[in-house]
């Protein structure tokens, strides 16, 4: 009873809190917060509800009871039922379904004597059976949950007891908010708790979150600032602080609050300090934390909402037709009621036909008709298929089973199959019309290879590295005898290169099987326990093709000039080193430290490498270098005090600096490089780790300096280090820096150590890590430089963002400003070249801050960090105040190769009639190049580019493009405008006109505005493919939502990262790709695959099968019920519409419930109208599902008409056969039931395209079960069901030849029209499905010839249509050559304007010129004929 009260109290509080949780009392007063100061006792105004956590110890006993005593304990209960409430609650839930309520109404109605049609108990049978089956299923499910809950609640953990003053064993269910918990390695965390102590020297705790979000890579959590420096374990009795944090919520990536000490000093808390329930402690000996959320208020439980429920398009169509069946039922019942009233009115005075009531009262015909209406409702209730929905669920489970059992979906490398997370929308896979795809990790492998870089305005091609990649690829191809016909490399798809670089690619970097990308195995542990295991997904970034980087010879020469002498005093004068040298040093330092890479030992990948501090190292000549770095920084800084050449006095006390706040120090979100191709929202990304390989050891000895690079005493060499990165981009940059002996040696929460060639080990004090977010699109690290002792900000991000944050340089300014402007212009040119080669680009920049500037920023940043409400906004504002007036150092180009089979899959999906949109965070040139490489765009496509700076210009440019497209197809009668029909594309599929649209993120923002949405959708409907570049996660979801809601089409979104989650959830079907980017996309998806190529078979084969199977099965159910119910309806015309049945009630009930239920289920699971091989070879067949050809509205009515015809035959053939005989009512009904059974079963045989022995076995079993039941029932039931008496009827009929003749004749006549129609359809006017079905019966040679003929006819139709389209044009323009895959952007056109004048046209539109004037300014190209 206590548990029930607590459960009710919990839900009541949740209900009350839900109404007030989001109520804000007003905007956050940031200026008042600034005035509070660091140790001010003034509490900022907090909006909404917050939680105060007081430690569960003796000194806080009264306060604990006041605050924490009201919170729920850690007991969980996921069950819905108890022994007392199971029956009423389960029935209550089941009667939420309209169908169950309908049949319950019929049961109640049958208990009314005036309208009773059946024996009362019989009417209840179907409903009772359905309710019982579902109740048993729910009960078993709930009992399983109960056992799991009991097991979890009784787990043991160490909890501090305030009475015994020590840690004691307690069950999880007894843990409360405020308890101190001590956990050891490999223990599961029992509740959400703030980390106060870790045995790790750096205050780090490693956790595995696979039980929470599916990710198996380890994550790091940080001890609360101020407790990490303690040498001993935290003593709960000495803990005198309290915690104030936000109310419980389900956001795994957010935790806001602060810890307030007894002296009112506050320390900000973030998700980096929170250990979540369900995670496991790894590689940490022991941790101590205080519980802040327990039980059902933990984030894990709040996220445990189960799979999302989606209703498929086919199910919505079936629900509509059920309503039509209800209308048909009402019409039939009204007919029976009117007929009964008319019949009684004719015999009103003849008591033989109109039997009076027991009191002698005669019921009027009108009232009798009213009663008969309800009697007919009961009699004809089978018209509404109660078993339809149960059968649909069974069929869907069978379909899902076969999808997951398909061996073609198995990924040997990842040991994964396709996951079907949504069980009720498999049929929607066969009706997809629009596909929205992410790029990185979805279309590409997300395995990054460092290819090129630009430093200080000089481009370094790394030609030797390119040759190495080629040789590596060729070696793999030779070993595997694998000939790749499609290029997997994006860099070789581009023709233009920098002037100083020569083309080194003689052939494509072909794709290779993914299981050869992992490299060799490595050894975990040592000694006897060591075992050799293959690389898993956590260590995927381990192939030599990814880890090895061959240095560029020109850059290598410049590195060799970097020596300590360059910075040492010479003849009492300081020689300024070349500015390019300083750029190179900072560039590679930024590559090495501007990340969150964790350095590990290869034999123990999870153990970090730590080095002694810089102060204890015998490093020579560094003191002399400091002054020069300071002077260089002075020249570059924009601070007035630094411009004067004076070193500012530190305004930050040592104690203040030592307590630097952690801004997501150890595990920020996926770094900025993710934005380069996709803007990432979530901080959780998959791990990529790798160790040095033999190839790198060979290149590692290349002399960057005149002397040898020495490692620290007792520390491993650079090639013995293992890097664990959150994304492959980070690891690629760190390995690139290591190739130039700028080696990341170690990383702790307080410092980063880099071994920089001749300069020796450099230890940077790590002040802050500002993680990546989708708004800033960059990440930064704030460090104190060991040489200059200045605060330096290193930033990396997308060029579109970094270029806007650079310090403004005037052409008339100082020489340094001019040089920076030149560097910026050259770097931008290099970035464009990289993007045209399909490389992912990043900009690297830095900023030097004075201590005064840093102290001011730090003060404001601390206040933002310790706020609870609006923390994200305040931290964003703080980061943007820091990341400005940057100095550009250079840029990088990283190659991300296409996945195996992507071009073929996209080509097949295009042929299937699916319009594909690529939504990416990449820049325009990169996105277009990759679109050509994966065959999303074809070389002869007409390419239109939307890249404007204003809304008006966007609208005018779209209008111009639409006019150009309309000119091309003005003679085509099939053209349809958007206002007429949004569902059909304006351009016929075989018109020969192929167009592609490229739109940037800024322009997309304009296009998504309500005033331009219709115009934008009309433009995209003309295009076969659309590429949205520089798109944010929010824009991705808005695009999907716009297309889905306005065009009323079936959409599918596929992605692999956290930035794709919103898009995946908005689409009709969301598919997650399990790869390098974690499991967020998979957890949010309806289906999960391991590679994009699996999508083609999932849609073209299984999607087609699921849709056609379920469509035909649903239609068959409607047909079967209408055909059988009409037998009862026709009989009413011969019994005075009295509501009498000519068959026994038991047979009537079991006809649908037992005799004819199994065959359609087997049909729905096993039917194959076309083989998988043919469906893959002929993707065009998929269009039948897009058009819903298997289940159209007229198909439903034709099916019902056929059912009416068959019921007429089934009734009147036996009627005329036995007319004039002395056959009684039940003897007449027996041949009707038997013939009806044969008709409905053989009807299914006619409709089946692939009969197997299972089909035949089930059909024969259904027939035998009917005869067996009829014989046994007729022999045993004499008067068990009055007034019917089926005694010995079947036995008599089975001895009568007329019975067999009637059954055969009735079945033949009833099925003859459908059989003749199917025969004529297959021979005279076969559909594409039937023509393709013929291929399955051909020999391999005949099949090959037939496929060539099919494809040849299709190409001939396209060519004919294309030439007709060209001849129909009035402009007579000469066709422009389509952009090639070699140089995608060269001949891309917009509004038929040459690429060279495109930007001028857009600029004119942006400046407000009219459309005509803009194109006049664009040059003479407007008049060219294309």
From Swiss-Prot:
It is an enzyme of class 7 (translocase). Residues 512-524 have a biased composition (Polar residues). InterPro entries: ATPase_P-typ_cyto_dom_N (IPR023299), ATPase_P-typ_P_site (IPR018303), ATPase_P-typ_TM_dom_sf (IPR023298), ATPase_P-typ_transduc_dom_A_sf (IPR008250), HAD-like_sf (IPR036412), HAD_sf (IPR023214), P-type_ATPase_IV (IPR006539), P-type_ATPase_N (IPR032631). Residues 119-121, 343-365, 1135-1145, 1217-1224, 1274-1292 are exoplasmic loop. Its cofactor is Mg(2+). Mg(2+) binds at residues 438, 440, 1056, 1060. The chain crosses the membrane at residues 98-118, 122-142, 322-342, 366-386, 1114-1134, 1146-1166, 1196-1216, 1225-1245, 1253-1273, 1293-1313. Belongs to the cation transport ATPase (P-type) (TC 3.A.3) family. Type IV subfamily. Its EC number is 7.6.2.1. It catalyses: ATP + H2O + phospholipidSide 1 = ADP + phosphate + phospholipidSide 2; a beta-D-glucosyl-(1<->1')-N-acylsphing-4-enine(out) + ATP + H2O = a beta-D-glucosyl-(1<->1')-N-acylsphing-4-enine(in) + ADP + phosphate + H(+). Residues 506-531 are annotated as: Disordered. ATP binds at residues 438-440, 730, 772, 796, 840, 920-922, 996-1003, 1030, 1036, 1059-1060, 1364-1371. SUPFAM superfamilies: Calcium ATPase, transduction domain A (SSF81653), Calcium ATPase, transmembrane domain M (SSF81665), HAD-like (SSF56784), Metal cation-transporting ATPase, ATP-binding domain N (SSF81660). This is Phospholipid-transporting ATPase VD. Residues 1-97, 143-321, 387-1113, 1167-1195, 1246-1252, 1314-1426 are cytoplasmic. Its main location: membrane. It is found in: Cell membrane; Endoplasmic reticulum membrane. Expressed in placenta and, to a lesser extent, in kidney. Keywords: ATP-binding, Cell membrane, Endoplasmic reticulum, Lipid transport, Magnesium, Membrane, Metal-binding, Nucleotide-binding, Translocase, Transmembrane, Transmembrane helix, Transport. The keyword tRNA processing does not apply. Changing residue 382 to T: Increases ATPase flippase activity. The gene is ATP10D.
